[in-house]
């Protein structure tokens, strides 16, 4: 299993930055894994358009340059791990 080269701090429903709540993407060559630690949140992918409701213990992969946004659904805690290669190719996300 590969280790992330960087991780965000743990965010809650109050500390989640506006930049993550709005549409954004990772850079070329950067995969993001969103990890819900507690509670629930919504992950919206822009292209192709889809929505995923996530609960504690779940993780979701964001591909390089894939536009997306997140929104808390009540109290929650989450973080994002960043990888320089596809973590799904090595082990379950």
Predicted regions and their residues:
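A short, N-terminal "cap"/entry segment at the start of jelly-roll beta-barrel domains
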Residues: 1-26
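Double-stranded beta-helix
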Residues: 7-15, 80-93
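Short histidine-centered beta-strand/loop micro-motifs
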Residues: 20-28, 44-45, 52-53, 70-72, ...
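Short, conserved beta-strand element in jelly-roll/cupin
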Residues: 28-42
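Beta-strand-centric surfaces of beta-sandwich/beta-rich domains
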Residues: 35, 58-61, 74
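Short acidic-glycine-tyrosine-enriched beta hairpin
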Residues: 48-65
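Ligand-binding loop in jelly-roll beta-barrel domains
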Residues: 64-89
